[in-house]
């Protein structure tokens, strides 16, 4: 049996036209970072999550860097992180000047 790892079929059948129109607006505007569409998304996301603000990021790495900076983590700090993660986790930590400290995961220690 082969199970596809990811499928957007359900979303496309429901809101495909809306997604295509939004993508075309972004492509035509040339504003891939920032711009009206991003501001609209951030405002809607803040509303859905019942927060005052929302900041979107272009990647998980940038999101981690932003989170670390918001906590004033930097040079001289150590950040404990899982050794069972994508390399971008450690990259984000070193990008702010901190040192990643890797821990192993074990069911008997949880």
Question: What are the residue ranges of the model-derived segments?
Answer:
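Alpha-helix N-cap/helix-start capping motif
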Residues: 61, 83-84
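Conserved small/polar residues in nucleotide/adenosyl-binding loops
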Residues: 108-110
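Conserved PLP-binding active-site segment in aminotransferase class I/II-type PLP enzymes
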Residues: 1-70, 74, 96
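A short helix-loop-beta submotif of the ANL/AMP-binding
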Residues: 84-103
């Amino acid at each position: 049996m082969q199970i596809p790892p990811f499928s957007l079929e359900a979303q496309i059948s429901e809101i495909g036209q809306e997604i295509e129109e939004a993508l075309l607006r972004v492509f035509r505007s040339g504003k891939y970072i920032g711009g009206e569409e991003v501001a609209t998304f951030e405002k809607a996301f803040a509303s859905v999550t019942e927060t005052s603000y929302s900041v979107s990021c272009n990647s998980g790495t940038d999101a981690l860097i932003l989170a670390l900076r918001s906590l004033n983590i930097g040079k001289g700090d150590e950040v404990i992180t899982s050794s069972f993660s994508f390399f971008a986790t450690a990259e984000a930590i070193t990008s702010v000047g901190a040192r990643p400290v890797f821990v192993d995961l074990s069911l008997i220690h949880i």
